[in-house]
Amino acid sequence: MYRRFAAALLSALLLSPGWLGMTGFTQLIGFVPLLWISSSYEGGRRNWWRMFGWAALTFVLWNAMTIWWIWNATPVGPVAATLASTTLNMIAFMLFHTVSKKGPKALAYTLLVAGWIATEYWYTVGEFSW
C-alpha cells in the first residue's frame, strides 16, 4: 500500500512541473508510476475500484498542484476545476485500465493515447475558463 501511495504521489509530482512553467521533461515519465500501479492489479471489480482510487488520488493531486492559483479569484474555483479536470483524466485512464485487463495491451495503450488526446481536445475547446 505504501509503495502504491508513493507511486501515486511520484506520478503527480512528475506531471506537475510542465504546467507550472518549470520543465516539460518530467511529463515524459510522469505516467510510469501510475502505469506500474495499474499493472500490479489483476482484473476484477474490486481491483477496478482500487485502481480507480489510486488514479483519482494521482489526478486530484496533480490538478491541485497545477491550478491552485485559481484560489485568488474564488475559493470555489479550484475545487470545481480540480473535480472537472480529474473527471476528464479518469475517463481516459480507467478506459485504459479496463481494456488492459481484458484485451490486448497494444489496444489498451492506443486507447490511452487516443482517449487522453480526446479529453484534452474536449478540455481545450470546451467552455472551461480557468
Feature names for model-found ranges:
Residues 1-130:
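Membrane-embedded alpha-helical bundles of multi-pass enzymes
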